[in-house]
């Protein structure tokens, strides 16, 4: 921004007009007045002819417009960079926007927020239906060895390699509030999985399927948790570069005869594709609720396995932290 404002100031500086060599520019009084600058001392006079004065005035006005335009654009750009993520909106505010107002802003990848309400879970005991359940990750870490030699495995910060399409939304399921204050949620339907790829500090990329399929979570509103299903990142019909698949393709790598070297133990995990599902665990916590509208928001932490490349690799633990939103009816 400083560089842009300096460039704007450079454009607004008066320049000498080389029409006649015998003319000397003694004052910038007219230019100063154009910019609203009052001269405190050293009043000078300028003996330019009328046509030269008009030309200088036009140049001054043009430089003024260009300078202010450049300065304004610099402020806009710097403000956008400082803002980072878009402002979090309520559910009604999101619904009131058109497609073009949402497109390219990042709002579609955000869960709604709540205005007002209370800082606890304030719903009466009973059976509800959770709708518009949304989970928005804000952090992805992967358990792996550090960059330094002989470092113990720990959750490492990662860099997101996919687009902003990792939020789960429109999830539905029964939500029960018991008289003792405990809650129970069962995931039944919705956009409950998203393919995500992150990169470790060493450059290794870790794909995984962010999901809460068949989640059954129970406990106090401050911390209710449960296990869920993590399907295989690839389906059984996926073929690897050598044409091998779970339900189709070659049984062994091309040019390796069946019953021979292709069935050796070290190659078995590559030849025999495994599409079995794994399990993950998530813990959710309510931070704010609004009973009059049925809205509730909170934070979550999920630990699930990464992709196994159809059984050829050992999965890594992926920790996902973020916020969630739901409407109870």
Curated annotation (Swiss-Prot):
What superkingdom heads the lineage? Eukaryota
Record keywords, A-Z:
Chloroplast, Manganese, Membrane, Photosynthesis, Photosystem II, Plastid, Thylakoid, Transit peptide
GO molecular-function terms, A-Z:
oxygen evolving activity
- Annotated function: Stabilizes the manganese cluster which is the primary site of water splitting.
Q: Which organism is it from?
A: Solanum lycopersicum
Per the record, the similarity remark reads: Belongs to the PsbO family.
Transit peptide: first to last position = 1-82
Which spans are transmembrane here?
A: none
Q: What is this protein called?
A: Oxygen-evolving enhancer protein 1, chloroplastic
